[in-house]
Every structure is written in structure tokens, then in C-alpha cells.
Amino acid sequence: MSPGIVSQEVNGRQEPTEAARDERHGRRRRVAVIGAGLVGSLAALNFARMGNHVDLYEYREDIRQALVVQGRSINLALSQRGRKALAAVGLEQEVLATAIPMRGRMLHDVRGNSSVVLYDPINNQCLYSVGRRQLNEVLLNACDKLPNIRCHFEHKLTSANLREGSMEFRNPAKEAVAAHADLIVGCDGAFSSVRQNNVRLPGFNYSQEYIETGYLELCIPSKSGDFQMPANYLHIWPRNTFMMIALPNQDKSFTVTLSMPFEIFAGIQNQNDLLEFFKLNFRDALPLIGEQQLIKDFFKTRPQFLVSIKCRPYHYADKALILGDAAHAMVPYYGQGMNAGMEDVTLLTDILAKQLPLDETLALFTESRWQDAFAICDLAMYNYVEMRDLTKRWTFRLRKWLDTLLFRLFPGWIPLYNSVSFSSMPYRQCIANRKWQDQLLKRIFGATFLAAIVTGGAIYAQRFL
């Protein structure tokens, strides 16, 4: 049994052990987790496995009963940090059983040609395309197996007093419901209601940045019961200032995300504009999507905004904590939003296992996490530039080839993407490694260039002077 995990299976249900019941001088904490998405349900599961009473609140209906899930991308890229968090609660293999491995990027140029850039040619590691709904259902089903978790769907947080641990919700009948908790954990997304309470507290630092790029989701359907493109890749159509990506789904379709500056979206006024734009920029994707389906999907909704949020501290005394997007929302271009949020839970669980006083535990979490959270927010911004533009440049291909060669020769030379996606190395250390590698390569190339000049000069002098 992992350190700090104090539950056991009894008659098919997870029951807290006696050690859990004795925690905190003979009583368990009552924890309120706000938000039953991926991070919230995972956090609830971990708190309950440590013996706490958990109330899990979600303002939407139970995703397992929803006919249509609105507002969020339907598939995600699961990497090592998320896998580690799922493995800790015994769910990794269940999730991977229905996930689709993506071994690299397949790049599509404007002429319709494609080429492959593998993520990890050395160890053959890959990302996994997972359905948001399916993953959320797996986590919620695991929560249902624990008797000390109570789920409250369609309960919207309307107010909270963090000092007192009191909350008020609006239930489906539009009635006010009062609740109390020893610890309030906000996992309620980029526009977190819990974080809004933190903003009003002294010493809380907060910044947000909207980028000038929006996104729309389209779909490449299956054909004759199969994928229309190779399934085991993240497909990218890089076009300098904009791009399109596609991830495979279990039903043999692809979820397509078109990311462009809002001014380009605004320039597409009608069906003819749209079709001409796709014929010019995405000629190979147009017949896969289908003209009529493209028109329907493109004009049925407006482009969505993307925001990057940084804040600190993540806690208030021993009363409240924020995790996931509530603490560090990021643009989706490194595929780390979900993975970073799940890693929050892993780190918090490890610190809780130290059994420090709760105020020290939460303070240690903030101190241990904020620099890494800031780092991945910055990396996500950078990767958007890389995906839409740099991936099609020869310099990017050269650096990728060089990183792969050096990684093969010197295992300690871990490329940036590998360290972020295929390890649990702290994000700030990933950046520090990249800076060190850049400096070393500059020195090597500088010395090589200088040696070439000196050698060339010497040869010239011998021959002509």
C-alpha cells in the first residue's frame, strides 16, 4: 500500500482502514472538492483514500448521464504525469485499454504532402489520445466505490467564506443549500469561484492573459468503419500564423481543432469564403471533413477564447486550496493542462503523507508547485508558436535530429519535449535543461565555425600569400 493511502477493498468496495480513522487525532477531515471534472474527481478520490469525508460538488449534471457534453474538447493527450497519477489510484491500465497511442506528429503541408516526426525514436514512448468524457466517467465510477465520498451534481457554488469553511450552493430546484468543510478544494476550472475568494485576500497575486487566437472544433468522421488518416499520430497542419490539429477517437473519427487569430475568423463571412479558405490552406483535409459538414460545424458556433492564468499562493491558511486550471490555466498547445492538474494531485498526496499540520502542508504545496506551474504556462505559449510555424522549418527538423542523436549517444541528454511529456522532471528543470543544451550547442557550433574560419584562412594564406 502506498504511503498515506489508507483504504482497503472489502466486498468490492474501498473501505478506509483503521489507520485512516485515527488520522488527525482520531477524526477525519471533512473536505469539500468544488468541481467534478478530471482533476476534481481525482482529488476527491485521493482525499477519500486517505480516510477523509469528501463532498464532491459539480454545477453541471452528472457527465455519465449527459446526452451531450458541452464546452470542452472531447479528447485529450495523456502523457507520463497523468499516467503516474492514474496509476497511483489503480486506474492507469483501465484508461489505457481504450486510449489510442500517438507516436509522433504527422505534418501536412499546403500541397497535401505529409511527413512524420516521431516523439521518441529511441525509447518509442508515445502520447495517448483519451476521451474526456470516458476518463471522467472512470474517475467518477471509482469515486462511487468509496463510501466516504458523496457526489452533488447540479450544485453551483454561489458564495464561500474561506475563513469559516462555509459555502452556499444553488441546487437543481434553485434552492440555497448551506454546507461546511474543514478544507475547501477548488478544482473548478479557469474561471474558478473558489479562486475568486482568494483574489480578495491580502498577499494573493494573480495575472491572466488572453491570446489573440481563438479555436473551433471540427470533425473528420470515420469512413466505412475505419479512420480516414493514420490513427497513431497527432496530425498538424502548420500555417505560420494559424494551424489545425487532429486527434484520433475510439469511434474512428478525428477531433479537429482549428486555431487562428480572431481577425482571420472574422474574414470568413459565408460558405464560399470558408470553402475557398480550406481549398487554399487545407486541401487534403477538406474532402475528409466533407464540405457540407465543414459548413455546418464552422458556422454553428463562435470561436472560443483561450486564456493563460498564473497566480499564487494556491492555499489560504489551512482552510482552502486550488488545483488544476483553477491554479494555473494554460493554452492547450503542450497537451499538459490535464497532466499538470493531475500532477498537482500527485504532489499534494505525497505532501499529505508526511502528516504535517495542514497549514504547513498547504504552504509546502504552494512553495513546491508555483514555479513549475508558471513554467508550463510559459512552455504552452511557446509550443503554439512551434506547432503552427517552427515544425515546418528545416532548423526545427535539424534540432530534432540533433537532439535524437545526442539522446541516443548520451542518455542524460533529454530533449525538452521528452522531459515534459515522458518524465516527471519538474517543469522548471525541463526549461533549465533546455537552456543548458542550447548554450552548449552554441559554444560547439561557435567553436566549429571559428575553427573553420581559421583553417580556411591558413589554407588561403599558404596558397596565395
UniProtKB/Swiss-Prot annotation:
Gene Ontology CC annotations of this record: mitochondrial outer membrane
Record region (Disordered): 1-26
Pathway this chain belongs to: Cofactor biosynthesis; NAD(+) biosynthesis; quinolinate from L-kynurenine: step 1/3
Catalysed reactions, as listed in the record: L-kynurenine + NADPH + O2 + H(+) = 3-hydroxy-L-kynurenine + NADP(+) + H2O
EC code: 1.14.13.9
Entry keywords, A to Z: FAD, Flavoprotein, Membrane, Mitochondrion, Monooxygenase, NADP, Oxidoreductase, Pyridine nucleotide biosynthesis, Transmembrane, Transmembrane helix
Biased composition, class Basic and acidic residues, residue ranges: 15-25
Superkingdom as given in the UniProt entry: Eukaryota
Co-factor(s): FAD
UniProt KW Iron-sulfur keyword: no
SUPFAM superfamilies: FAD/NAD(P)-binding domain
GO biological process assignments: 'de novo' NAD biosynthetic process from L-tryptophan; anthranilate metabolic process; compound eye pigmentation; kynurenine metabolic process; L-tryptophan catabolic process; NAD metabolic process; quinolinate biosynthetic process
Record membrane topology: Multi-pass membrane protein
Pfam families listed in its UniProt record: FAD_binding_3
InterPro entries in UniProt: FAD-bd (IPR002938), FAD/NAD-bd_sf (IPR036188), Kynurenine_monooxygenase (IPR027545)
Gene Ontology terms for molecular function: FAD binding; kynurenine 3-monooxygenase activity
Family as reported in the entry's similarity comment: Belongs to the aromatic-ring hydroxylase family. KMO subfamily.
HAMAP family: Kynurenine_monooxygenase (MF_01971)
Protein's name in the database: Kynurenine 3-monooxygenase
Taxonomic path: Eukaryota, Metazoa, Ecdysozoa, Arthropoda, Hexapoda
